[in-house]
Swiss-Prot record:
GO cellular component: cytosol
Organism per entry: Coxiella burnetii (strain RSA 493 / Nine Mile phase I)
InterPro entries assigned to the protein according to its UniProt record, in alphabetical order: AlgH-like
Stored Gene3D superfamilies: VC0467-like (3.40.1740.10)
Pfam short name (any one): DUF179
Domain of life, source organism: Bacteria
Protein name: UPF0301 protein CBU_2093
Similarity remark: Belongs to the UPF0301 (AlgH) family.
Length: 194
């Protein structure tokens, strides 16, 4: 199903029906919060109680090799050591998350795990083929994300696995917005309501 038209209308429809899970939030240019400037967030969970997401384009000065070394996990595949670790959000940055794809009878699903066993499997090249490693997450209380979207802080964009796993980190902000036909670089930092 392809939806077209004003992305703000699409955002309102999605918010009112609470179907933001498995979507991206793309920070609008006027969002001047250090943590969220030019952020792309994968929304893992959204319901009446709030939302949880992971920033997918903010690398830390940390690699998976350093994390595995800290956890005393031996690396069987040397190339895995250079895998970037991302700042997943401002909450719980002492906690790590693995964002990965898993096949199910309903099709591919994106899941989050905090399992040390999964990190061990990844180090042994027995884990998922595609994954992100993050520290922290972004969270919203009931109604908070909806208010931010209504304030034009975020574009709501349908999920795309290439953006999540294949697009270079520096290109994800532009490429995610382009999924709904928006050239984010052409938008003004001064946006309001008509």
């Amino acid at each position: 199903m392809r939806l077209s038209g004003d992305p703000r209308i699409l955002s309102v429809i999605m918010v009112k029906t609470n179907i933001l899970s498995n979507h991206f939030l793309v920070a609008m240019p006027q969002l001047n919060d250090f943590t969220f400037t030019k952020a792309v967030i994968y929304v893992s969970q959204h319901d009446a109680k709030g939302a949880l997401g992971i920033i997918i384009n903010r690398p830390l000065a940390l690699t998976l090799g350093k994390v595995l070394e800290h956890l005393n996990i031996e690396i069987a595949q040397p190339q895995i050591a250079n895998h970037p670790v991302l700042m997943g959000g401002p909450i719980g940055q002492e906690h790590g998350f693995i964002v990965y794809e898993q096949e199910s009878p309903q099709g591919a699903e994106i899941l989050l795990s905090a399992s040390k066993d999964m990190l061990d499997d990844i180090a042994k090249n027995k884990g998922p083929d595609d994954f992100l490693i993050t520290l922290g997450y972004a969270g919203w209380e009931a109604g908070q994300l909806e208010n931010e979207i209504a304030r034009n802080d975020w574009l709501v964009v349908p999920f795309n696995r290439k953006i999540l796993f294949e697009t270079p980190l520096k290109s994800r902000w532009q490429k995610a917005a382009a999924l709904i036909g928006v050239d984010i670089n052409q938008l003004s930092g001064q946006i309001g309501h008509a």
